[in-house]
């Protein structure tokens, strides 16, 4: 491979566990670093950076959360009300500040409400509404050396951006070098009709800058049926510059179980280790073949 892809884990799957404890567990499992939930108010960037670096890790990205945890905190870049759109821009800017403070590379953005497949006006009107807010956020990100990556989410959970090609079409309309796209394998296996590897190759190195990883069952990679060898080979073929951030859940568990602390630490860590080892071994196999 052109380089070894690094592997991270998104800290939302740990629920309310304190960050120092999460970092200790992530380091013990063997990850290269972490992706932080995009809640800038709960972090001290200087303290986070020190905790992470002391463990020999790094922060790869910030996971934008749309909406926020409080009622009315929509963070909605496609809202028909300009004041609400501005609140969304301000939120993304706060995530950019966090990313810059902890040394992260990118901030994930979703231009619609996760968990709400309905549109507010119409799909076209909502897409039109988010162009200028995304451009404002991208300009700010560029000033701080941070990429914004639009995440497509399956049609049962959002109303606007479903596929990688949807995300690229939107990014092209925004027309700023700091707005790119990413993919989440759990959502991609629903929306990418000819397969995840083909979607990655079509996107190419420039656009495709980050990946979330979980198997088709939302368990750790290797515990389901997704073609991980082909997925990693596609990333190699486009000379992927980003990282892979795992966010799996044990079978039968939901994000709400993670939020509420209903996933035993031993089970979660064991499955994260299975997934990480599987991806690393698969990457090594590909490297041995192509070198």
Where are the regions that the model predicts?
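Basic, amphipathic N-terminal segments that precede the first structured/catalytic domain
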Residues: 22-42
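Short amphipathic alpha-helices and their capping/turn segments at secondary-structure boundaries
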Residues: 40-60, 89-103, 131-139, 196-202, ...
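Active-site-proximal loop/turn and secondary-structure-junction residues that shape catalytic pockets
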Residues: 13-15, 19, 40, 65-68, ...
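Histidine-acidic metal/acid-base catalytic patches
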Residues: 1-7, 15-27, 103, 161-183, ...
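Conserved beta-strand positions in the central sheet of alpha/beta enzyme cores
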Residues: 35, 61-63, 108, 149, ...
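Active-site acidic/histidine proton-transfer and metal-coordination neighborhood
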Residues: 78-180, 190, 266-271, 289-290
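N-terminal small/glycine-rich loop or linker at the start of catalytic domains
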Residues: 1-11, 65-79, 111-118
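Glycine-rich, proline-tolerant flexible connector loops at the mouths of alpha/beta enzymes
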Residues: 35-55, 111-122
